[in-house]
Amino acid sequence: MKEQEREAYEYANAMPRNLFKALADFQQEVPVIHKGTTGYGYTYADLPAIFEAINPLMKKHGLGFTQLMQGTSLETRIFHVESGEYLQSFADIPQDVQLKGMNNFQVAGSAITYFRRYALSSALGLVTDKDTD
């Protein structure tokens, strides 16, 4: 086997196949999550709405997630419960943002919540849209 073929073989066998299959199955079933919260001049799907939509399907497909702060970065980890395979991403949370009428702790909490929503949505391939009902 040539070196390049061996590297390709090793890479393919190191892929988190169980996680990828479970994630693909999850993505086929997860609904569009409606944006039902308004704030700061725009409409968005809040974390409770996202959790309500994804948690039963994540359990069904053997998936879980964690979101932990690592210094000023948010680590989002999507994992396959049985195999332990995981994907992770990091998002740096800006520290120099100021919002009118909010103290530094409120701004930090708002930023963390904002990044949690978007990091989780991105990692899971979620789609959010305005509720037209």
Predicted stretch roles:
Residues 2-133:
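Polyanion-binding surfaces on beta-sheet-dominated domains and ring/shell assemblies
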